[in-house]
Amino acid sequence: MQDNTILELAYDISQVTREKVGAIEEIMQTTKILALNARIEAARAGTAGAAFGVVAEEIGNVSEEINHIASDFRDAVEGHTSRIEDVGERM
């Protein structure tokens, strides 16, 4: 396999990975909005919605954790993509 082919394959993989991370970030944003809406509805329900409020809070926490993981992953992919491009330019 030629070096250019390997670099193209690595670059393509990084692009697909970047797209998948973007999709994860979109899902995280939707989850965050749903958690906020659930908190609002739990507050409206008063005491009867207290347990639902706890669940909504936990969903929000999970959403934030996903956000941090996706951000770290995106940074790693961007770094690898940049290195792949640098190697390609030097060839």
Model-derived regions: residue spans:
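Short, low-complexity N-terminal regulatory "tails/caps" that precede and couple sensory modules
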Residues: 1-8
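Parallel, heptad-repeat alpha-helical coiled-coil signal-transduction segments
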Residues: 8-30, 43-86
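N-terminal glycine-rich anion-binding loops that anchor highly charged ligand groups
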Residues: 33
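Alpha-helical coiled-coil heptad-repeat segments
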Residues: 88-91
